[in-house]
Amino acid sequence: MQLRTNVKHLQGTLMVPSDKSISHRSIMFGAISSGKTTITNFLRGEDCLSTLAAFRSLGVNIEDDGTTITVEGQGFAGLKKAKNTIDVGNSGTTIRLMLGILAGCPFETRLAGDASISKRPMNRVMLPLNQMGAECQGVQQTEFPPISIRGTQNLQPIDYTMPVASAQVKSAILFAALQAEGTSVVVEKEKTRDHTEEMIRQFGGTLEVDGKKIMLTGPQQLTGQNVVVPGDISSAAFFLVAGLVVPDSEILLKNVGLNQTRTGILDVIKNMGGSVTILNEDEANHSGDLLVKTSQLTATEIGGAIIPRLIDELPIIALLATQATGTTIIRDAEELKVKETNRIDAVAKELTILGADITPTDDGLIIHGPTSLHGGRVTSYGDHRIGMMLQIAALLVKEGTVELDKAEAVSVSYPAFFDDLERLSC
C-alpha cells in the first residue's frame, strides 16, 4: 500500500476508536457475571471480536445490534465446554486473560491463534495458574500456543510476586482469584494498567490495592452492569504525535480515556515541550478531550516506572523522538520484544529505512534527532501499531514514496485509521 506523504498540515476533530483494553474486559466481565451487561461504544476491531467469539463458543449468549452489545451472563458456572479449539486470532489479551477465567472451569479447553500469537510466551501466565491448581500447558510441550487448560473448581489462593510488569498476567491471576477460596495477593513489579481492578469493583466485586500490592478474597459473584467504553489513548497516540510533528497542525481528539495508568505518553510529551491540553475532563469516568498543536520538541529519557504506562505507545513515541532536538533514550522496555512482533527491532529497522538515526538496545532504543525522513519500502510485520506508526512517519516524507507491506494489520485496533487520517489531511 502506498502511504500518504508530504502533508502540509493536519486540522480537524476526531472521535478515536473505543478503548481496546476495556472492550475486551467488558465482554469478559459480562460473561462471568450474573445478569445482563450492556456495552456501548464497543471496539469492533479484530482483537475484540476474537474475545466476543471466544465467549460465544463457551456458551455465553451475546447479542450485537450494531450499536449496543448485550451479554447475558450466568456467572462462572454458566461457562460451558467449547466444542472446538478457541481461535484468539492475533489477540494476546484474549488468550492470557481467558486462561485466568478458564482456570476455575472443570473442563478442558484448547486455545490457539495466528502465527504471531504462536510466538508469544505463556509461561508467565501458566506458572501462577498451575500453582493455583489448574493444569495448563503448551500443546507442543513448549510455553507457546496452542495452549491446553483444564480448570478445577478447587482453585487455591496464591501469594505471587510478579517477575514482569504485565497487566495481562495480573489480570489472569485476578480472574482466577475470583474463583478461589481464600485471599490471593499479587505484588506487581511496576504499577500497570488497572482496568481489571476497576471493573471488578464496577461489577460489584471487592479488592484492596496498596501501592503495588493487590489483595482479593474469593470466591466472589459479580453482577451485570452497563458499560460505556471511552476512546482509546493508545489509538489517540498516533494523532497526538502527528499533530505535534506535522507543521501548522491542530487536532482535537474527543472523549479519550485518561486512566492514570495509561497516560504516560502525555507525561513524555510534556517533558519534550509538546503542546497537548486536556479539555472537558470527566474525572469520574477518566476521560476528556485532547487538543494537540505543532510544537518544537526536545529529547528526553524514558524508563523505569513510566514504561508500563506507555508500553503500547513506545513505537509512536520513537517516531516523535526522531523529530526532537537531542538524543532520546528509551530503556527498561524489554517487554517490547514479546509483543505482536519484536517492536524494538521492528521500529529501529523500519525507521532507519526512512532515514531516522535510531539504534536498538537490549531493552530499548537510542534516537538522535531531529532527522529528515525520506521514502522507502517498509513493513508492519503484521503488527497494527508498527503499521500506524509508519503511516505517521510517512506524513513527514517530502521526497519519494513510502510503500507499506501488510498495511491491513491496522484493522486489529483501528479499522478506520486511514480514513480518519485522510479527513484531517490538507
Curated annotation (Swiss-Prot):
Kindly state which keywords UniProt assigns to this record, in alphabetical order: Amino-acid biosynthesis, Aromatic amino acid biosynthesis, Cytoplasm, Transferase
* SUPFAM superfamilies tied to this protein: EPT/RTPC-like
Gene Ontology MF annotations = 3-phosphoshikimate 1-carboxyvinyltransferase activity
- Active-site residues per Swiss-Prot or TrEMBL entry: 312
User: How does the annotation summarize its subunit structure?
Assistant: Monomer.
Describe the task this protein carries out.
Answer: Catalyzes the transfer of the enolpyruvyl moiety of phosphoenolpyruvate (PEP) to the 5-hydroxyl of shikimate-3-phosphate (S3P) to produce enolpyruvyl shikimate-3-phosphate and inorganic phosphate.
What's the name of the protein?
3-phosphoshikimate 1-carboxyvinyltransferase
Which organism does this sequence originate in?
Answer: Enterococcus faecalis (strain ATCC 47077 / OG1RF)
